[in-house]
């Protein structure tokens, strides 16, 4: 059983790395792509954000299907399907090609819900936070592509760079054929029954909001920073890619730390600090005329989003152990959608005002609202615990 645990944790975590590497292909190479395909600023924002749509919405059925058929089959099918949009993008010569191919790249982001549904089955509840945190560190795949793809593209061209990812996908599909767990525990409760059990629970929607902000901030900065740093601060694509990779690395490496801390202390207390930090970072980014101050604000977002992501996914199986697949899918879908809207909002704000301050202040205000909600949830839990203890004392 121990070997089975470690094999699945390693294989599924590496699979998430591969999926996220593919997911951010367009945003990582957009500076080189626009040399061949002319795009307006609005079209660039749309093209870089479009993979997030399917990458978010597909997480709900993938979470459910993982519970029903197992991670082995779902990872295999996902990697095989990804071969088609990756090849399409490698021969793209129009805005339509980038939008159509980019939409189906979203499968790479959707695979997240496979592991967070599958892996807790192999471990006791007190380890769910750190296990999901380790798996979530597969986000580092976005850093790998963001840093490496522009460098490789300078040497061989962006189309050849994209084609290299076909090999990566084929390798991981084969790894799941060989080492995927054929005997994973399956849950065959109907999707209708699972949805009925969770959708009226306000905790599900609070967790969805929290992940909308923490993971949404991570995704939004990942897809927006490479082009933003080039356009706004005049950096070259390789330098912008390196800085974005640094942001991703900090956030990703702190995700397991968030899960570990949530296993050891109150997850809601941790989220208080997370949202307080995001509130502060939004204010800093709103008034960042220099690259130094902007870097500090971005790294604050990286720290808070990483710890917050790990903490939220400690809470999902804690509250919804019997409906983990559908609950994981809904919460992670909301997180993905949180990465879709900010780039479009920032682009619209910039076109209307010539600056990004209002867009970053919106991050601060939403984070502040979540901070208040977490405090409310924390005191509700305290009151519930106090009431239960009093009733036990009376009995």
Curated annotation (Swiss-Prot):
Keywords: Cell membrane, Membrane, Nitrate assimilation, Transmembrane, Transmembrane helix, Transport
GO molecular function, one term: nitrate transmembrane transporter activity
GO biological process assignments: nitrate assimilation
Location within or outside the cell: Cell membrane
Membrane topology, from the record: Multi-pass membrane protein
Recorded GO CC terms: plasma membrane
Record SUPFAM superfamilies: MFS general substrate transporter
Annotated transmembrane regions: 15-35, 44-64, 73-93, 96-116, 133-153, 160-180, 203-223, 240-262, 271-291, 293-313, 330-350, 357-377
Function comment: Involved in excretion of nitrite produced by the dissimilatory reduction of nitrate.
PANTHER family in the record: HIGH-AFFINITY NITRATE TRANSPORTER 2.3
Family assignment from sequence similarity: Belongs to the major facilitator superfamily. Nitrate/nitrite porter (TC 2.A.1.8) family.
Protein name in the entry: Nitrite extrusion protein
């Amino acid at each position: 059983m121990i070997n089975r645990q470690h094999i699945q944790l390693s294989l599924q975590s590496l699979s998430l790395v591969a999926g996220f590497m593919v997911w951010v292909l367009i945003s990582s190479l957009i500076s080189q792509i626009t040399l061949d395909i002319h795009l307006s600023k609005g079209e660039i924002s749309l093209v870089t954000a479009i993979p997030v749509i399917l990458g978010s919405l597909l997480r709900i059925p993938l979470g459910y299907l993982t519970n029903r058929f197992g991670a082995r089959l779902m990872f295999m099918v996902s990697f095989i399907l990804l071969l088609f949009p990756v090849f399409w993008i490698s021969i793209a010569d129009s805005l339509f090609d980038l939008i159509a191919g980019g939409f189906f790249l979203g499968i790479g982001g959707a695979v997240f819900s496979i592991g967070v549904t599958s892996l807790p089955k192999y471990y006791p509840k007190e380890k769910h936070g750190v296990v999901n945190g380790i798996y979530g560190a597969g986000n580092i795949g976005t850093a790998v592509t963001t840093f490496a793809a522009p460098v490789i593209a300078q040497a061989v061209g962006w189309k050849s760079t994209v084609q290299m990812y076909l090999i990566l996908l084929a390798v991981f599909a084969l790894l799941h054929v060989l080492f995927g767990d054929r005997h994973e525990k399956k849950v065959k409760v109907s999707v209708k029954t699972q949805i009925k059990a969770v959708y009226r629970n306000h905790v599900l929607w609070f967790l969805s909001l929290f992940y909308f902000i923490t993971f949404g901030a991570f995704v939004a900065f990942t897809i927006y920073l490479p082009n933003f740093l080039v356009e706004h601060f005049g950096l070259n694509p390789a330098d912008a890619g390196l800085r974005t990779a640094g942001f991703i690395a900090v956030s990703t490496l702190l995700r397991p730390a968030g899960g570990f801390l949530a296993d050891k202390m109150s997850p809601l207390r941790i989220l208080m600090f997370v949202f307080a930090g995001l509130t502060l970072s939004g204010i800093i980014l709103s008034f960042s005329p220099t690259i130094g101050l902007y870097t500090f604000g971005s790294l604050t977002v990286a720290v808070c989003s990483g710890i917050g992501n790990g903490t939220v996914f400690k809470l999902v199986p804690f509250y919804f152990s019997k409906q983990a697949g559908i609950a994981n899918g809904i919460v992670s879908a909301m997180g993905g959608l949180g990465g879709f809207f900010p780039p479009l909002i920032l682009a619209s704000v910039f076109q209307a005002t010539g600056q990004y301050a209002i867009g970053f202040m919106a991050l601060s205000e939403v984070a502040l609202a979540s901070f208040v909600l977490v405090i409310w949830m924390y005191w509700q839990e305290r009151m519930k615990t106090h009431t239960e203890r009093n009733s036990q004392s009376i009995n």
